[in-house]
Amino acid sequence: MKKIASSAKQFVICVKNDGYAVSLEKRKIYAALADATAARHGLMRVVDESGEDYLYPKKFFVPVALPFSARRAVMKAA
């Protein structure tokens, strides 16, 4: 599986996965990558179950602030 790039500045929790049940698990933490163009279209670039980043509807996720130790552990586990 691909390591999460250090450019992953935000973590999000999946709250909806309609049509993407294979790629996204509800209640799971994912890394979100900055993508201004996607954001303008209501999308978010997320590293999904495949280990690759794809665009998903922004409404599928809520941002989460992780303590530094948790953030480091999540990035290391990816």
Residue ranges and their predicted role:
Residues 1-3, 47-49, 78:
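Conserved functional hotspots at enzyme active or ligand-binding sites that engage polyanionic ligands
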Residues 13-25, 29-56:
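Basic/aromatic-rich interaction segments and small domains that mediate binding to polyanionic partners
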Residues 1-16:
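SH3-family beta-barrel domains
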Residues 55-78:
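C-terminal structural segments of small proteins and small subunits
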Residues 4-7, 31, 69, 76-77:
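Residue-level detector of intrinsically disordered, flexible termini
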